[in-house]
Amino acid sequence: MEWDRMISVIPEVIQDLKSEYTLINPMIRDDIFGILEKHCIVVYYPLFNEKNCGFHTKRFIKDKREDFVYINTAKPIAEQVFTAAHELGHVWGVADKILSKIDTNIRLECDDEEKLINRFAAELLMPEKEFRNLFFLNMKELSIVDNKIKIEDFIRVIVMQMNDFMVPYESVRRRMVETSLITEEVGKLLDKNVEFIQALVSAFSKDLNTILDNVTEKKTIPGLRALVDQIEQGKLLDEYTLCKVKKDFDIDSILGTDTIIDIKIGDSADGED
């Protein structure tokens, strides 16, 4: 099947991406934001009544098309992490790279491309080897040795996986099916009882003192303060627009930053005084 062929080359595509960075830990977690910021302009802003966790778009900036990604920081950090990985897949053109590697002329429908990008994000954030290893370690930590366990104990393991990889419940549920840790039937059972399970997830997440549900409400675009300073000094925007940007992104004036201080630095790197 074409789907199986596409899935089979995702690890190779991920390795191509990782080769651009010095990533010691295969578990990327919230380092994904820094990686995304190297590939596009990222806007972090909370929209509390918006269901969407984020999106990718392109805009012309000085006659050049630039990639923009919006991350809704009103969502829990775990959802922000997976959204960042998903949107990185769009920015990096993962679907085209995958189709190129399997040498096919098929065109993906929008839903199929989203499904493929979700799989890329899952494999990027939850590499199979590490995901399986931690699953069995977490089972051992809870002294679970039998294949037949109470659903309460199994949800505890899922929450531990969520915390290890900093991803939401649904991502872990799907990944467990993808890595053959649970069957399709068990995956459907977990999906069917989602409201009951989400209550358990929330309770166990608090019990483990995780940050999975933390809502950052961050308002920024990396480098925005320096850009605003340049615009202000060069009078490149009218006062009203400039004030609105500062207000929308909570940019306060910092006094005393022009003060010169005399610092004493010890021996230099080459040993000279």
Regions found by a protein language model. Give the residues of each.
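Active-site hotspot residues in diverse enzymes, especially metal/ion-binding acidic/histidine motifs
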Residues: 1-273
